[in-house]
Amino acid sequence: MPKLLVVETSPRGAASISRNITKTFVAKWKAAHADSAVVQRDLTGTGLEFVTAPWLEAYFTPPDQHTDAMKQALALSDELVAELLNADELVIGTPVYNYNVPALLKAWIDHIVRKGITLGMDGKGLLTGKKATVLIASGGIYSEGSPIADRAIAPQYLKLILGVIGIENVTIVAGGGAKAVDMGEATMDGFIATLDSELTAAAQ
């Protein structure tokens, strides 16, 4: 049974363009994988903290030497890592803030890049064989040929970090120009329809 882990980052709820793109993708993925399971991880409701000194102390201490406090410091990180390890496929739905990923998504990344678990002690990624789809909603259009294509930092970063942990099969669906929805120049459904063929292909 294929299992899909869905990581959501936008705080905008039903008004979120990235969440609506993700919703469409998940529906297509479920249709293409009848006997499947979907695990939802909404980072806005996770209580995810940024890396702290106690977290780092626990991170660099061998597991067999962990105190109860160290185990507690890594508890949420362990939970997030387990979700990723148990998934066959990963989809990340995210807006773009100031050309990069939201702070919450960066925090999730810091919690799941774990030496000896998702990243080998030799620096090689351990999550080989998994597939990832990154769904991005951005106000600007950063596709090839755009005069601001060099500002496509978010997709470059996410593809890089996924590769670091061993996920090389990464599909990026970039919903550039999403500000048209917020400005009333396009409907949500109309905007997502422009991505339909890419979403369908990515969901297979």
From Swiss-Prot:
InterPro entries: Flavodoxin_fold, Flavoprotein-like_sf, FMN-dep_NADH:Q_OxRdtase_AzoR1, NADH:quinone_OxRdtase_FMN_depd. Binds 1 FMN per subunit. FMN binds at S10, S16, I17, S18. It is an enzyme of class 1 (oxidoreductase). SUPFAM superfamilies: Flavoproteins. Pfam families: Flavodoxin_2. Its EC number is 1.6.5.-, 1.7.1.17. It catalyses: 2 a quinone + NADH + H(+) = 2 a 1,4-benzosemiquinone + NAD(+); N,N-dimethyl-1,4-phenylenediamine + anthranilate + 2 NAD(+) = 2-(4-dimethylaminophenyl)diazenylbenzoate + 2 NADH + 2 H(+). Its cofactor is FMN. Keywords: Flavoprotein, FMN, NAD, Oxidoreductase. One of its GO terms (molecular function) is oxidoreductase activity, acting on NAD(P)H as acceptor. Homodimer. Quinone reductase that provides resistance to thiol-specific stress caused by electrophilic quinones. Also exhibits azoreductase activity. Catalyzes the reductive cleavage of the azo bond in aromatic azo compounds to the corresponding amines. Belongs to the azoreductase type 1 family. This is FMN-dependent NADH:quinone oxidoreductase 2. It comes from Jannaschia sp. (strain CCS1). The lineage of its organism: Bacteria, Pseudomonadati, Pseudomonadota, Alphaproteobacteria, Rhodobacterales.
